[in-house]
């Protein structure tokens, strides 16, 4: 799939665009390994949901963009093996040239494919699946279907978590959330929208997730100390929105 790729810079931030003003990824030039956009940080809440200190060991990222999530996991989780699926080789080239995508075939495997086709033709499982794939108009296409979410579930390990970037202000948002819930037998939770309008949905397979917001805050402090990523504002917003019934994050 050929995409019109634009690279822009303003106030020290480099952004990726697919022929429109829609931001497909961003990198602060002085801190290329950090997560610049709010929704990418919120997707990393998934790292707090399993107590195993080695989690995640196997990660699948569908949609490369500016490689923000890929770079963060690559740098901060050196034991993790990363599979990245991107439909457009031009996006991969842009990520390498402008966004410092690492070249490490031992740990980072790039697949030029549609995410749905890739899942259909592999028997692998992952501890964490991150879905963030849109076209120039913000459409996820086949990556927002019941069949796709069922495939994601089938490819999760017993510790498996899926995090999906949805557009909370889009007309089909509620239908997207319902598709995820149905695919995961109700084991899904949706965060309140970021200021950008992005909403992150989480779903789980295998072992149950049941942890208090207090425990999540403790885990967030440890993550901040280790990686510099501060998820405490995200958890505070989650608490204020009363998203977690009884103060429990359950999947």
Stretches with model-predicted labels:
Residues 1-11, 15, 23-32, 38, ...:
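SAM/dcSAM-binding transferase cores
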């Amino acid at each position: 799939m050929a995409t019109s790729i634009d690279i822009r810079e303003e106030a020290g931030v480099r952004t990726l665009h697919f022929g429109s003003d829609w931001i497909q990824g961003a990198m602060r030039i002085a801190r290329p390994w950090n997560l610049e956009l709010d929704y990418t940080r919120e997707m990393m809440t998934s790292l707090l949901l399993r107590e195993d200190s080695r989690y995640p060991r196997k990660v699948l990222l569908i949609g490369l963009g500016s490689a923000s999530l890929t770079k963060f996991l690559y740098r901060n989780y050196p034991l993790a093996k990363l599979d990245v699926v991107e439909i457009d080789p031009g996006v991969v080239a842009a990520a390498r040239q402008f966004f410092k995508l690492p070249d490490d075939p031992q740990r980072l495997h790039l697949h030029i494919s549609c995410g749905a086709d890739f899942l259909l033709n592999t028997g692998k499982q992952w501890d964490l699946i991150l879905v963030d794939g849109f076209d120039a108009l913000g459409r996820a296409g086949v990556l927002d279907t019941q069949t796709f979410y069922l495939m994601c579930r089938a490819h999760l390990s017993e510790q498996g978590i899926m995090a999906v970037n949805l557009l909370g202000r889009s007309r089909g948002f509620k239908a997207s959330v319902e598709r995820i819930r149905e695919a995961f037998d109700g084991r899904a939770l949706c965060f309140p929208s970021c200021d950008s309008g992005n909403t992150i949905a989480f779903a789980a397979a295998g072992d149950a997730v049941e942890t208090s917001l207090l425990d999540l805050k403790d885990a967030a402090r440890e993550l901040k100390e280790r990686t510099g990523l501060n998820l405490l504002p995200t958890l505070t917003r989650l608490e204020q929105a009363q998203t977690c019934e009884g103060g429990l994050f359950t999947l």
